[in-house]
Each structure stands twice: as C-alpha cells, then as structure tokens.
C-alpha cells in the first residue's frame, strides 16, 4: 500500500510541475512580422557583370502571452508566374532560450543566391526588358511542426542597403 501512495504522490507532483511550466506559444498565435522591406541586394560582380539578389528583411514580435521557442524562418523566391524556385534561404530565428511575450527580434535578412546579372548599372537593371518581378513567400516553423506561411509579397524594384548577417536570438 505504501508503494501505491508514493507513486501517486510522484505522479501528482510531476503533473503539477508540468502544468506550472506551461507550453510554448505556437507560430500562428505568437509571431507578428513587422518592419518588412523587400528589394534587391548587391550581389557583387561575377564575370564582369553586376548582380542583384532578391531580398527580404523583417523583424518579428511575440504577440502571445507566453514565450515562443525554436523558430526557423524560410524565404522562398520565385519569378512571378514561374512555379520553379529561384532561390531560398533558411535561418534559425529564435533559439531554445526563446523570445519572451511582447519582445521583438531582428532584423532578419534573407536573400536568394540567384538573381539578375547585367553589365549596366544596378539601378538601370530594373528597366531592362528582360527583368521580371519576383515574389517572396515567408514561412516560419517551430520545432518539428509544419511550416506556416507568414506573408507573400512582390519584391520591390529598389536597391537595399542592409546588414549582411541575420539576427538570431539564442
């Protein structure tokens, strides 16, 4: 009889402890994307040509009442009307320590490794007859959960001057 009481006590204590810890917020309820900028980043020179890479920069805020942990962000770039992916970039955005309720992190800068090349000045490349607009889909994923689409935007025909390294919260 003593063993059964002891097991019940351990089970009850474990359940109370687990209930007190609470669960992490999920991507749909917690992640708010703001301060979004799209455009083309300077991709340097390749074979004597200027390169432009479609890019998105953004910040996120935890709008939930509890922390969110382990969130990755993925930007997928496509030429409008083309089902093939032009490029994508995945970053670890929020680590194991989490993002507390009401806090924000970023900016994150994600870019395609493929874009446009030309001999003309970068600003003039937007006027070229072969230039086609690109769209970006931004996704987030928490742990082993499914990807959630956060936004879909047409990349603005503008040059961006933004930091090269994405910010991450460990």
What positions do the PLM features span?
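Short acidic, flexible loop segments centered on an aromatic residue
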Residues: 65-85
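Short, compositionally biased P/S/T/A/G/V-rich stretches that sit at domain boundaries
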Residues: 28-47
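Bacterial signal peptide processing site
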Residues: 21-25
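Short, solvent-exposed, Trp/other aromatic-anchored flexible loops in extracytoplasmic proteins
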Residues: 89-149, 154-161
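Bacterial N-terminal signal peptides
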Residues: 10-19
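Bacterial N-terminal signal peptides that target proteins for export
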Residues: 1-10
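Short, solvent-exposed loop/turn segments enriched in Ser/Thr/Gly
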Residues: 49-57
């Amino acid at each position: 009889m003593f063993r059964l009481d002891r097991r019940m006590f351990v089970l009850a204590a474990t359940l109370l402890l687990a209930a007190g810890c609470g669960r992490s917020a999920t991507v749909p309820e917690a992640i708010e994307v703001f301060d979004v900028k799209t455009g083309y980043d300077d991709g340097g020179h390749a074979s004597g040509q200027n390169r432009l890479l479609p890019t998105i920069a953004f910040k996120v805020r935890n709008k939930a009442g509890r922390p969110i942990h382990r969130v990755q962000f993925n930007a997928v770039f496509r030429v409008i009307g083309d089902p093939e992916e032009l490029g994508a970039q995945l970053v670890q955005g929020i680590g194991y320590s989490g993002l507390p309720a009401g806090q924000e992190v970023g900016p994150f800068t994600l870019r395609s490794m493929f874009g446009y090349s030309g001999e003309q000045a970068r600003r003039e490349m937007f006027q070229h007859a072969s230039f086609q607009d690109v769209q970006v889909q931004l996704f987030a994923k928490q742990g082993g959960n499914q990807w959630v689409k956060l936004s879909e935007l047409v990349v603005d025909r503008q040059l961006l001057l933004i930091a090269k390294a994405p910010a991450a919260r460990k």
